[in-house]
Amino acid sequence: FSRLSLQIDRNNNSSNMMECRKLKDLKVSSIGLGCLPMVGYYGGKYNKQDMLALIRRAYEKGITFFDTAEVYGPYLSEEWVGEAVAPFRNEVKIGTKFGFGVEEKEPTALNSRPDHIRRAVEGSLRRLRTDHIDLLYQHRVDPKVPVEDVAGVMLDLMQEGKKLHWGMSEASARSIRQAHAVCPLSAVQSEYAIWWREPETKIFPTLEELGIGFVPYCPLGRAFLTGVIDENNRFDKSDRRATLPRFTPEALKHNMPLVVLVREWAKRKGVTPAQFSLMWILSRKSWIVPIPGTTNLDHLDDLVGVTDVYLTACEMEEFDREYSKIGLMGH
C-alpha cells in the first residue's frame, strides 16, 4: 500500500489541479468520469445540455479521463462525450469499448470479429469527433474469437494511429496474458469496490507482474457506499439495480452495517462516504484509476474533493479487519 511508487504528477491543463497516474504509459487524472449513468442506465432521462455541462465541469475540476462505450445508449454516450470535450480534445484522454453486436441490433450479443471491430472503431471515431482513441477496450472477451486475433487487430489499429493504447474489460488472468503477448495492454477494467474485491486475487498479481493499469468501474458500489441508499430504497424496473442480488430489500437491510462502517471511517478522515470509498481504492495500488459515474453536479464536486489524501498501511489493515467481520448478502 506504499505511496512511494506512485507517479506523482499534476494535471496543469485545467483550472483545478489533480494528481495524475499512469495506466502503463497513458497518463490520466487519478480519477476518471464514467459516462454510462448519463444515458439512463440507472433509470431516468437526462437532458443533453445538462450532461455536456457536467462533462465540461469535470474537466474544469481536473478530470482528464472520460470512459464511454458504443453500447452505452447505444451510441449516445459517445456522442455526448465527443461533443463535450471537442473544445479541449487534446487535453483529455478518452476510453471507449467495442465487443457487442450493436450494429446488428443485438446489444447483448458478443462480437469481436476483426471486421466488426474495425467498423465499430470507425463509428466510435466519428461519434467522438476525433481521429484517434486514447484507450480502446474489448468490452467482454468473445469465446468465439481468440484473444490473440483481437490483439492482432489492436496492433494494426495502433500502427495506423487510430488508437494509442488498448485494454480489456472483465477478462481473466489467462486471457490477459494471451492478449498481452501479442499487443501489450495498458489497462484492464473490472468492477471493484470496498464490497467487491474479486480482482485482488484473480487479476491483480498478473497486472502487477505485467505492468498493466487497472480501471475499476462502480467504485462506489452503484451508490450504495455513498450512504444515499438505505434499506427502504426500491428501484424502478428501468434501473439496472432492480435486477441485482445486492439490491434486493433483504440484501439492502443485511448489508447496512457496511454503510455504517464507511460512514464512521469517513467521519474519522474528515471526508464524505463517497470520498472515503474512492480514497480506499486509490490507496490500494498506485496503478489504479477509478471511474465513478454521476449525473449530478454536486455529486461530481464531491467525487473530486479528495484525490491526494490516502490511507496508511496501518489504516488499511484496520479497516479490512473491521470489514471482514461483516457478512455481505448478494455477492
Region roles according to the model:
Residues 26-31, 62-64, 88-92, 130-134, ...:
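Short, well-ordered coil/turn segments that N-cap beta-strands
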Residues 46-50, 76, 80, 108-116, ...:
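Alpha-helix N-cap and loop-to-helix initiation/capping positions
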Residues 8-93, 328-331:
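N-terminal binding-site loop/beta-alpha segment at the start of enzyme catalytic domains
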Residues 125-143:
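Active-site groove signature of glycoside hydrolases
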Residues 37-42, 101-107, 299:
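A short acidic, helix-capping loop that chelates divalent metal ions and anchors anionic groups
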Residues 33-35, 68, 135-138, 168, ...:
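Conserved beta-strand positions
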Residues 141-330:
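Beta/alpha (TIM)-barrel catalytic core signal, keyed to glycine-rich beta->alpha loops juxtaposed to Asp/Glu
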Residues 45-58, 113-127, 174-176:
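Short, acidic/polar
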